[in-house]
Amino acid sequence: MELVAGCYEQVLFGFAVHPEPKASGDHEKWTPVADFTHHAHTASLSAVAVNSRFVVTGSKDETIHIYDMKKKIDHGALVHHNGTITCLKFYGNRHLISGAEDGLICVWDAKKWECLKSIKAHKGHVTSLSIHPSGKLALSVGTDKTLRTWNLVEGRSAFIKNIKQNAHIVEWSPRGERYVVVILNKIDVYQLDTASVSGTITNGKRISSVTFLSESVLAVAGDEEVVRVFDCDSLVCLSEFKAHENRVKDLFSFETPEHHVIVTASSDGFIKMWKLHEDKKVSPCLLCEVNTNARLTCLGVWLDRATDTRESPPPDAETPPVSKEEPSKSNKKESGDEVQEGERQSKPGTKKCGSTGNGDKPAKGNSLVSAKKRKMVEMLGKKGNSLVTAKKRKMVEMLEKKKRKKKKM
């Protein structure tokens, strides 16, 4: 297991953590060991995502860098966006979805690192996105004061909900029965079956990160040193604890066979691991901490296993979420503050698309160029067939002429 964190200083940190064998129960401790630093970006890191093989980072330099956790090498960069990368989400090990300040949401093949789909998702920035556990839906919010639902099977917009303010976080619950939308210091809890707000949670200060601990329990961090745990049904704060000496920038949670773990990163430079108790009203125990001496911005945990139960697709969702089909024409029908539509696929800008890299494998080419090459190959194949057919026809005609001459003789 490794804790990975990005910072303003353009570096990705990696720390391997191991449980101390003699400690257990409330005295359980883990030991962090510095494993790597990766300086690939030319501006501060803004987002990080992890699957079983790779860590990807987004930056204000408008690129997404890929780091191979197995080989501990740079695997290249994805260069399609024209703006700060604001959010990155893996769906299992096959797909990565990115959002940026250019308003685009891109779906990437996480094997070939090709851009499968590029959608103009918001009129302003894309500020956050979240993938439903089924892999068939995604939610996004942006600076155009909209909450958008995406059909990932067809690669198009399904619904648009107008909200009164710009939201900066959206997150599905583990089973996908509810989701939360964060605006400043308020959390609106939505039910999937009604698509309406069932309640609102208010935090002390602006919220920077949320993570579901269960279907109804949500951990919340903001522009303060405290982490709070809320019940999404009763909207009550179950507990709170001081996690850092400065504001908490990001949260990440996962389960081990023994207990639930929450990881926090702060602008004070510390990454900390906490063991949560079954009774969420009891404050968690600190498992380990490490000081990066940097201003941390984003956080992830690499679990070093083939399947992560929170991110791997269920058996019936193994098909790719989108294919390289033609964009559907816009067909909008407005009803109140909700719109159902088929979204046009955006045309990639003149800047860039696809992957460039210096890993052990050759860098994957521009996905658009690849498509052109495939088309050319198909066209050449067709021409070749037509030439062969013409030759065959000519030979048949010559044979028929010879037969006619023999008959006349």
Regions found by a protein language model. Give the residues of each.
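Beta-propeller domains
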Residues: 8-31, 60-62, 66-70
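Short C-terminal beta-strands that terminate individual repeats in beta-propeller domains
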Residues: 25-28, 35-40, 74-80, 115-121, ...
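Solenoidal tandem-repeat scaffolds enriched in leucines and small polar residues
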Residues: 114-204
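Short loop/turn segments that connect beta-strands within beta-propeller blades
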Residues: 18, 69-72, 110-113, 152-155, ...
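Loop/turn segments within WD40 beta-propeller blades
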Residues: 47-53, 71, 88-94, 98-99, ...
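Terminal intrinsically disordered, low-complexity extensions flanking WD-repeat/beta-propeller proteins
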Residues: 1, 11, 20-24, 44, ...
